[in-house]
Amino acid sequence: MNPRYPAVSHRAVHRCEYCHAPEGIFNLPFEVEHVIPISRAGTDGETNLALACRSCNLHKSDHVTGIDQMGKPAVRLFHPRQDDWEEHFIVELETGRVEGRTDIGRATVACLCMNEPLQLAARRQWISLGFYE
C-alpha cells in the first residue's frame, strides 16, 4: 500500500475524488494517484496526489486533458486540489449519471468513462442505500 494512503484517503473522506464512489463499500482500498502524472512532470507532493477508485484511475491513466463533448478539444481534466467538485459536476439521483457542468467536468466525465453501464448500476444502488452523496 502507498505510504501516503492514510493521509490522502482521510483528506478525500474515503471517496474517489473524481466520481465520488464511496470507498467503504469496496473490498479493496482505493488508489493514490498522481493528478499530474510523473511522466508529465508531476511531483510526489501532497498537492499532486488524489484518491481514485480503480475505474477512474485506469481510465485517467496519464491523461491531463480530455475532449469536452460540446466540441471543445484539449480541455484540462478536473484537479481535486485546485477545483471544486460541485462546481464542475452534478449527479442525477434518479439515473445515477455524473454530468459535467463545465467544460472541465464534461471532459473529465468522458475521459474517465464515469457513466459506463456497470458504474451507473452501482451508483444507483449506492444512492438507494444512502452511501452516495
Predicted features along the sequence, with ranges:
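Short beta-strand-alpha-helix junction that forms the catalytic/metal-binding core
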Residues: 16, 40-60
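A short coil-to-beta-strand element that immediately follows conserved catalytic motifs
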Residues: 26-30
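Extended charged
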Residues: 2-7, 11, 22-25, 47, ...
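Short, intrinsically disordered, charge-biased short linear motifs at domain edges
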Residues: 1-7, 36-43
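Histidine-centered catalytic micro-motifs used for acid/base chemistry in nuclease
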Residues: 31-37, 53
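Right-handed parallel beta-helix
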Residues: 18-20
